[in-house]
């Protein structure tokens, strides 16, 4: 593993302490985010995700998000060939939690906006106002071709035009309960949704291209971005700066939430050994599929999420930022993340979710300056 850059010395301001949110990216697909024969092999189930999110809630995580994936990468591990559906999963999780914010992902090519508006209002009712929607345009062509709904490769260059109309319909229906929107992609004729959500519905996105960030700057409450590298916790700073600049153009406050995988153990060496073991078992067949799909979009620029996912540097965990080290080392690196202007939170995955969240809550989070404001844990069993 390449040695990390020298760590920075910094002091968190009070407002930075308060802004650092923590979320869990729940494993809605088999094997989570490690494309390796050496990683834990498991199927996605409601019971597993319930245990994960309830444990996250116990440890004061702020939110839980599930993706949507309609076709996997295959290979020896059948990576992401087995997936639950996001809205129905999160509706179930909303019913068995009480404080944590819940986000489902809408694959917008598969669901009309009026249906998403009504489903979201329903989960708002289930959750008591704790629900929000992550909107994705879709990048993996075979997911949609298999159902006969891929609109053609011109969609790659028009997908944010499509999403702009989509979110305008959502805002109409969540706001007034009625939409007469007329556009190139959607035509509403006295379309109605009632009841409306009990609180303003949060919309989140994960744009890293210029078009994606421009969309988030106009319409999203916050924007996800990839962390970068291994033990380089501030390497994403230029991406956060781009998002901050885009938001300044619209006069809105749209922060960045950064995706990281945590691989922690008692010592740096023990954690590094796990990481090297996972890399040694990389599922090359599944990774080849990912690389092939990343080359299909030739129209969206070089900074798309899928191109980062397929980069060979650390493809075994789709090139999300990776924090490998002792519990103290990971805590220190997460505090460094919090020091980056525009970084309002992190979205975490783990090599082993149940033990990973418990170790995070018991042994990492208490060492983090940017989480020092949290109340004491209750004695209830997580």
Swiss-Prot record:
Coiled-coil regions listed: none
NCBIfam families in the cross-refs: RutA
Binding site for FMN: 68-69, 134, 143, 159-160, 209
Keywords: Flavoprotein, FMN, Monooxygenase, NADP, Oxidoreductase
MF GO annotations: alkanesulfonate monooxygenase activity; uracil oxygenase activity
Organism this protein belongs to: Escherichia coli O1:K1 / APEC
Function: The FMN-N(5)-oxide reacts spontaneously with NADH to produce FMN. Requires the flavin reductase RutF to regenerate FMN in vivo.
Protein name: Pyrimidine monooxygenase RutA
InterPro entries with a match to the protein in the record: Luciferase-like_dom, Luciferase-like_sf, Pyrimidine_monooxygenase_RutA, SsuD_RutA_monooxygenase
Biological processes annotated in GO: alkanesulfonate catabolic process; nitrogen utilization; uracil catabolic process
Induction: Up-regulated by the nitrogen regulatory protein C (NtrC also called GlnG) and repressed by RutR.
Gene responsible for this protein: rutA
A Pfam family per the record: Bac_luciferase
Family of the protein in this entry: Belongs to the NtaA/SnaA/DszA monooxygenase family. RutA subfamily.
Broad enzyme group: oxidoreductase
Catalytic activity: uracil + FMNH2 + NADH + O2 = (Z)-3-ureidoacrylate + FMN + NAD(+) + H2O + H(+); thymine + FMNH2 + NADH + O2 = (Z)-2-methylureidoacrylate + FMN + NAD(+) + H2O + H(+)
EC number(s) given by UniProt: 1.14.99.46
């Amino acid at each position: 593993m390449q040695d990390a850059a020298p760590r920075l010395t910094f002091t968190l301001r009070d407002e930075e302490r308060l802004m650092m949110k923590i979320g869990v990216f729940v494993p809605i697909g088999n094997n989570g985010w490690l494309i390796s024969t050496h990683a834990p092999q498991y199927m996605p189930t409601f019971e597993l995700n319930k245990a994960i999110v309830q444990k996250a809630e116990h440890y004061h995580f702020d939110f839980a998000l599930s993706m949507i994936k309609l076709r996997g990468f295959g290979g020896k591990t059948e990576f992401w060939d087995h997936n639950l559906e996001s809205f129905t999963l999160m509706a179930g999780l909303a019913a068995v939690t009480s404080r944590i914010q819940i986000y489902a992902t809408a694959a917008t090519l598969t669901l009309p906006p009026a249906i998403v508006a009504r489903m979201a209002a329903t989960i708002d009712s289930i959750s008591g106002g704790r629900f929000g929607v992550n909107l994705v345009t879709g990048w993996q062509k075979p997911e949609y071709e298999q159902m006969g709904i891929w609109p053609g490769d011109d969609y790659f260059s028009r997908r944010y035009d499509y999403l702009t109309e989509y979110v305008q319909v959502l805002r109409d229906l969540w706001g007034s309960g009625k939409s007469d929107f007329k556009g190139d992609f959607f035509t509403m004729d006295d379309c109605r949704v009632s009841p409306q959500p009990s609180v303003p519905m949060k919309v989140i996105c994960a744009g890293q291209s210029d078009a994606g960030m421009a969309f988030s700057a106009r319409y999203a409450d916050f924007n996800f971005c990839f962390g970068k590298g291994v033990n380089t916790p501030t390497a994403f700073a230029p991406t956060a700066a781009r998002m901050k600049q885009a938001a300044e153009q619209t006069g809105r406050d749209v922060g960045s939430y950064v995706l990281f995988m945590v691989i922690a153990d008692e010592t740096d060496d023990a954690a590094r050994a796990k990481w090297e073991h996972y890399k040694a078992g990389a599922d090359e067949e599944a990774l080849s599929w990912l690389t092939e799909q990343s080359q299909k979009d030739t129209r969206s620029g070089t900074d798309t999420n899928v191109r980062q996912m397929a980069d060979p540097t650390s493809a075994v965990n789709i090139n999300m930022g990776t924090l490998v080290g002792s519990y103290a080392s990971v805590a220190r690196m997460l505090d460094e993340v919090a020091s980056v202007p525009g970084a309002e939170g992190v979205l975490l995955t783990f090599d082993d979710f149940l033990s990973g969240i418990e170790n995070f809550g018991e042994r990492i989070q208490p060492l983090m300056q940017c989480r020092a404001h949290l109340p004491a844990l209750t004695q209830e069993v997580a």
